[in-house]
Amino acid sequence: FVNKHLCGSHLVDALYLVCGDRGFFYTPMAXXELEDPQVGQADPGVVPEAGRLQPLALEMTLQXXGIVDQCCTSICTLYQLENYCN
């Protein structure tokens, strides 16, 4: 694994590779912190579950201060990715 910028589908693919059967997770920001208040009011069928792909816009909005900052904006290590595994 080479430390590099991982964004969008490349980031999700890397998480699947690193986490394998354990799956992965993220911690969304509180609804008041979201740019679009409608995002926090998604249908229960759209609520993210560990290791499931989400619509990219929702995923990027909810993760803006976490894994995206660590791995897309900055360069990410294998160990940083493992922090998001279940």
From Swiss-Prot:
The keyword Secreted applies. One of its GO terms (cellular component) is extracellular space. Keywords: Carbohydrate metabolism, Disulfide bond, Glucose metabolism, Hormone, Secreted. InterPro entries: Insulin, Insulin-like, Insulin-like_sf, Insulin_CS, Insulin_family. It comes from the Eukaryota. Disulfide bonds join 7-72, 19-85, 71-76. Insulin decreases blood glucose concentration. It increases cell permeability to monosaccharides, amino acids and fatty acids. It accelerates glycolysis, the pentose phosphate cycle, and glycogen synthesis in liver. Heterodimer of a B chain and an A chain linked by two disulfide bonds. PANTHER family: INSULIN, INSULIN/INSULIN GROWTH FACTOR. It is found in: Secreted. Residues 33-63 form a propeptide. GO terms for molecular function: hormone activity. Coiled coil: none annotated. This is Insulin. One of its GO terms (biological process) is glucose metabolic process. The keyword Secreted applies. SUPFAM superfamilies: Insulin-like. SMART domains: IlGF. CDD domains: IlGF_insulin_like. Belongs to the insulin family.
